[in-house]
Amino acid sequence: MSIFSRLFGRKNNLTISSDIKKKDARSRNIAFVDTEVGLKDHKIHDIGALRYDGANFHQASQTALNKFLQEGKIDYICGHNLIHHDAHYLQLNGILIDTLYLSPLLFPKRPYHHLIKDDKLMSEQMNNPVNDCEKAKELLMDEIAAWNQLSERKRKIFTLLLQNEEEFRGFLMYVGAIEKDDAIIEVSEFILSEYKNHICANADIPALAAQSPCGL
């Protein structure tokens, strides 16, 4: 079973709201957020956040976190396993970027880049969510650098396949890679050109792209 098959146990049917679709990719005010949640009581015990301007937040208050983010006019909220962990406990108003799912895509030879068990980041100071925010920031910078090293054709392939998947859309918006929805018809040509020696020329790529874009 592939890494993506393990990460994506279900098919995502993401509906993108019109306000997010219209978001200016040049507006890049970002904050990094991490929570410490009790394993038994499933309650938030601590919250850490780090804004693009260097300001940090460290207390277990959703209300105070919202104020901190609003003061920074935050557009993007980034974290490690943010979408399927932290966002379940927090009411986050922003475009979400999750570094967890980008890692196997951009670092295929070391897919658990900067990761440890339970899908959390290694931290010099364990159980310190602010420190985890710093690590998430470092990982995002690495992922952006890796993205920029990809060929233009490969970036097109990843964007066309993944831009409507919630685990990837925020990142693709942040780097200004979103394509028009009807551009998906071009993905077969790009894939056959990029992987011509590794894929059957008769493969039904449109069907695969529709059924399992992450797996493809």
Which positions does each model-derived feature cover?
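Acidic, Mg2+-coordinating catalytic module of metal-dependent nucleases/exonucleases
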Residues: 115-194, 200-202, 206, 213
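Sequence-level motif detector for i,i+2 pairs with an aromatic at +2
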Residues: 27-28, 94, 182
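Short, intrinsically disordered, charge-balanced linker/junction segments flanking boundaries
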Residues: 79, 90, 204-216
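A short catalytic or substrate-binding loop motif that flags glycine-/basic-rich loops and adjacent residues
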Residues: 25, 39-42
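Two-metal-ion RNase H-like nuclease active-site motif
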Residues: 28-38
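Conserved DEDDh/DEDDy metal-dependent 3′-5′ exonuclease domain
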Residues: 41, 50-147
